[in-house]
Amino acid sequence: MTTIHTLGYPRIGAQRELKFALESFWKGASSEDDLRATGSALRARHWAAQRDAGLDFVTVGDFAWYDQVQQTAALLGAVPTRYGFDPAQLTLAQSFVLARGNADHAAMEMTKWFDTNYHYLVPELTPDLLDRQWGPGTEWLFDEVREAQALGHRVKVVLLGPITFLHLAKARHGLADKLALLPQVLQAYTAVLQRLAALKVEWVQIDEPALVLDLPQAWVDAFGPAHQALAAAKGPKRLLATYFEAASHHAALIQSLPVDGVHLDLVRAPDQVAAFAPWSADKVLSVGVVDGRNIWRTDLTRVLAHLTPLAQALGDRLWIAPSCSLLHVPVDLSAETKLDDELKGWLAFARQKLDELAVIKRALVEGPAAVQGELDDNRIAIASRTQSRRVHNAGVKKRVAAIRAADAVRAAPYPARADAQQARLNLPLLPTTTIGSFPQTPEIRRARAQHKRGDLPALDYLQRMRTEIADVVRRQEALGLDMLVHGEAERNDMVEYFGELLWGYAFTANGWVQSYGSRCVKPPVIYGDVYRPEAMTVEWSKYAQSLTSKPMKGMLTGPVTMLQWSFVRDDQPREQTALQIALALRDEVCDLEAAGIAAIQIDEPAFREGLPLRASDVPTYLEWAARAFRVSASGVRNDTQIHTHMCYSEFNDILPAIASMDADVITIETSRSNMELLDAFAEFAYPNEIGPGVYDIHSPRVPRVDEMESLLDKAAQVVPVQRLWVNPDCGLKTRGWPEVEAALQGIVEATHRLRAKHANAKRAGSKAAHVEGEMA
């Protein structure tokens, strides 16, 4: 009989119970026993959901207090040495020190989990780990297995695989080769598998998503010996799981591994199963056919047509699952109160995806007639979405199709634009500015919430926001900044604010997903063709500009970021949706210009996040992503200055694409790297203007003036001073006014000092500046 299972389930709870329990514990408002009780209740509820839906196993090992990669490290005994903690006795409080840091220890580094919006804690591998035996680590996994078994569940354990674990880790303090630690890692995994066998666990899902990547040969070669060692452990049966992309380029390797089954993601790569034919007669094939990363209902008719031949060929050896862990989607659609019935009928959250698996299984095992009602309901929902006028707008599609090459190019090259912009803006050498947002006080948040509930009339809300804007403008002028912003008091979130004003977007009430630890996000839903019914920011920026003679930046979120931080429709290429958003933003940019706004910032913090996992797919993505930005920005005159902002730790591999965006000014996060990120821009000879951040807004610490002056000196050594701007690393929304004003005062003072050192230099925008810039 066909087996159905899930690779993982959301851990936060339908009402974000884990988030609130964690934050209560961290504040000292509740005990560790209280926190553990919440975790136990959530696990029991989630296992019951899997059982009640008819899954053949419940998945154990997907729960984590903060992050599953950190918990894997704790299980293996791979706690970073610098903390001085005993791996075998690691307490819950100590595990939070690893994740969050304290006065004595910096937190572990955090980065994106493959190409998702989830963040994991990066394991730290140091040379001293070569000389010690790994394990035993903490007992959490075995405790949770016993917990599930005590509730009567049939258990399948999920465990991050050894090669992916090492690949995701970082070598530190001179460790030359992460793979040198493979023997220690395998020793620990062997002990874990043997413990699981003693607990009568039937199956262990070994997650090796690194197999979808372009791996160096040494890493490819490591899979064979590693999984031979796991096989020798005589543990439970092992299901090797790959996801997020095709693993077909490693098909021969995967087929050779001594595992009992393999999971393939057929949502991201539906054709890859052919590369594995003929399937081994003694192995299970698990196919991921329900999308674990998006919120749309599965087209069950299409999936069954695909699976029926596989079911006939494999029989009981066919397993069915989501494409990946359901960690990346909200928990339960039944908790959703904000969406209308039509749109809600197109969606499936984690709990509903379990039900979809059950329908697929019954249709394959008992025949479609056994679930005819469910299949008919699914067909109606799929047809409704396909044919809905809310989804399809002929005018939007026609406008995208009509985009010409000239629509994605500024009227003149940068040097000519720089002349026109300097003539209009008359900026000094090393102009000072900020990234956009200013502190959001409790009063600001309260006014927004009251207005949203209908408790604060529109005119009263407008006046309160105008008062905040006037205060922000006054403070910036008093500080002596050169280019001002309005402060974004009216915005709760840089994507949600615009999404609420664009057609084609919808917002859930409880569509929360975990980003990391206790941080949850509620991505908007792009369900249809996107267009702008009316101006979104013009009146705010126009009012702010009326208060000052200094230039005021308009502030927008770019098309790629609007795309990346949303649940995106899956019925057309992402490029098309990005271009629709770009055209909506283009209209806003042109309206801002017409209202007298001379500088417009189009933020793209998620530009790099969209990079595909496979190198062969990267050029296509970068081409359309940069084009979408240019479409949004290229409708303005030469004397209107276009800014963008990005915050990454690595630019080298995407610098040509960033240059092709052709923003007049790019501001970047550099203070934490001590300006080292600028080296890449210098080596590439980035042609336009750059604003390297000199103040780390993520820290409450206010840097000294001499520190910021030193950072600017370093910046001026790698980028011509004529093209340098001075700014913080990022927006100031989360900081308090006292530290913000102190830091900005320091920025202005450091800038004055640097201007004195370069008194003879000319700003970009004069012929003399072009010559000097070329000579620098």
From Swiss-Prot:
An example molecular function term from Gene Ontology annotations: zinc ion binding
Pfam families: Meth_synt_1, Meth_synt_2
Record keywords: Amino-acid biosynthesis, Metal-binding, Methionine biosynthesis, Methyltransferase, Repeat, Transferase, Zinc
Biological pathway: Amino-acid biosynthesis; L-methionine biosynthesis via de novo pathway; L-methionine from L-homocysteine (MetE route): step 1/1
Its EC number(s): 2.1.1.14
Keyword Zinc: yes
Residues the record lists as binding L-homocysteine: I435, G436, S437, E488, D603
UniProt similarity note: Belongs to the vitamin-B12 independent methionine synthase family.
UniProt name for this protein: 5-methyltetrahydropteroyltriglutamate--homocysteine methyltransferase
Organism ancestry: Bacteria, Pseudomonadati, Pseudomonadota, Betaproteobacteria, Burkholderiales
Gene: metE
